[in-house]
Amino acid sequence: MEIDKIALNSYLKIHVDNFDSLVSIEKFGTGQSNPTYKLTTHKSKYVLRAKPPGELLKSAHAVDREYRVIKALKNTDVAVPKVYFLANDNDNPLGRMFYIMEYLPGRIFWDPSVPEVDKATRTGLYHSMCQILADLHSVDINKVGLSDFGKPGNYFARQTDRWVKQYRISRLNEEPVMEKVISFLEDCLPVDDGQISLVHGDYRLDNMIFDKNSTKIIGLLDWELST
């Protein structure tokens, strides 16, 4: 879907502080369930992340939840981009919900084996991943205003139930082996220990932006499945 650059430029000048004239809109082409674009102005760069057009599964593509959690983590040890604005209704140039965040120039590694770097660098990258994950799970959800971000109760049961429903809504044919997998998962759910922490939901190497010259993570992305 092509975006009306003139209309979007006028809209963002109203809603994003210090937004100047929009020069170009470039769609990121790799692995985005929510369409994501780089916006280049005369003075800066931004990222626009939107719900896809058309009919969507209930609770899928929750860019408003992404915006909320990224904004809440702004002053924590978890590296996230700055967010500037959420268009939380359809009365905008895209006709669907989207948000604007900071563009972070850095490195993204798509292959988990990271063959393009040496062993020491690879070790450093994965150490940074472990550190950010520990920082995330140490966030006090009450202090950052996310006490109501997730639903109460057994997380494992909720996740299993959610994905079973998503599968059954979107399946095309009967798959007996999938029913066996579902039964196995439902019979083997771990007991909920009552501990609560923030979960990213899609924590993997290519959802992170690394500093250009070090193994430091400068931005953890794609919070669509966070809870």
Each PLM stretch: what is its role?
Residues M1-V23:
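Juxta-kinase regulatory segment immediately upstream of eukaryotic protein kinase catalytic domains
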Residues S10-Y11, W163, F184, W223:
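Tryptophan-centered motif/residue detector
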Residues Y11, E55, Y203:
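Aromatic/pi-system hotspot detector in well-structured domains
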Residues L22-K180, F184-L198, K212-S214:
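ATP-binding pocket architecture of kinase catalytic cores
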Residues S197-L198, R204, F210-T227:
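Active-site Asp-x-Gly
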